[in-house]
């Protein structure tokens, strides 16, 4: 039986490889009407792609943001329906969280191709990996985590990313909050936004290419 696992860096045998120093930007816990549009504006300013791991309940309540993400050339991926710790969920609940989130994304934007999933809190169980694979989703973790959700300051976020990235790195950032937190507050991700506007040009100056996550089979 094939052992299931998640991907925390993109290996050199994938579509882009690491010869061109590829980096992959990802955002969790959106879409959020106060944060996601500004994140998208910065990405558009620099012409770089990202993958948004969205929560299904937010996809249902903010379908226009799902459509905008896709229309602007980014990927929408699965971050479960309600953001539970999947390791505490039974098999049927795990399956429901995964399947309903993908359905919510497609309902919001039929053009969306849901190919990837990230477990809430980065907590993967064998059940979550198995159910994700059964749903045709590749499990994606991360290799660079500046813990921007803790609001350490824009400088700290920038430094943490630049200090930890290498070719193939998957960078974790946030454009929202889980449903059990106050995710609708204006300014919630202002530090992430400020940091992003510095991270992208700094990565380019270091010779990195920011690319969309390649498909995995």
Curated annotation (Swiss-Prot):
It is found in: Cytoplasm. Residues 21-211 form the NodB homology domain. This is Chitooligosaccharide deacetylase. It comes from Rhizobium meliloti (strain 1021). PROSITE patterns: NODB. Keywords: Cytoplasm, Hydrolase, Metal-binding, Nodulation, Plasmid. Its EC number is 3.5.1.-. The record marks 148 as: Raises pKa of active site His. Belongs to the polysaccharide deacetylase family. GO terms for molecular function: hydrolase activity, acting on carbon-nitrogen (but not peptide) bonds; metal ion binding. The keyword Hydrolase applies. One of its GO terms (biological process) is carbohydrate metabolic process. Pfam families: Polysacc_deac_1. One of its GO terms (cellular component) is membrane. The keyword Cytoplasm applies.
């Amino acid at each position: 039986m094939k052992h299931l696992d998640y991907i925390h860096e993109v290996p050199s045998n994938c579509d882009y490889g690491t010869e061109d120093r590829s980096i992959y930007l990802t955002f969790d816990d959106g879409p959020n009407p106060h944060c996601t549009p500004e994140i998208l504006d910065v990405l558009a300013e620099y012409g770089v792609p990202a993958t948004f791991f969205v929560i299904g309940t937010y996809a249902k309540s903010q379908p226009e943001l799902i459509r905008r993400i896709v229309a602007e050339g980014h990927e929408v991926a699965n971050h479960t329906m309600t953001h539970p710790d999947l390791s505490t969920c039974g098999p049927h609940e795990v399956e429901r969280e995964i399947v309903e989130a993908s359905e919510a994304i497609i309902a919001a934007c039929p053009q969306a191709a849901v190919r990837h999933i990230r477990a809430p809190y980065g907590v993967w169980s064998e059940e979550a990996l198995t159910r994700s694979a059964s749903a045709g989703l590749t499990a994606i973790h991360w290799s660079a985590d500046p813990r921007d959700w803790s609001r350490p300051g824009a400088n700290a976020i920038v430094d943490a990313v630049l200090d930890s990235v290498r070719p193939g790195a998957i960078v974790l950032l946030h454009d929202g909050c889980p449903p059990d937190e106050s995710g609708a507050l204006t300014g919630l991700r202002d530090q992430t936004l400020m940091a992003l506007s510095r991270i992208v040009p700094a990565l380019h100056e270091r010779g990195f290419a920011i690319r969309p996550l390649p498909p995995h089979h």
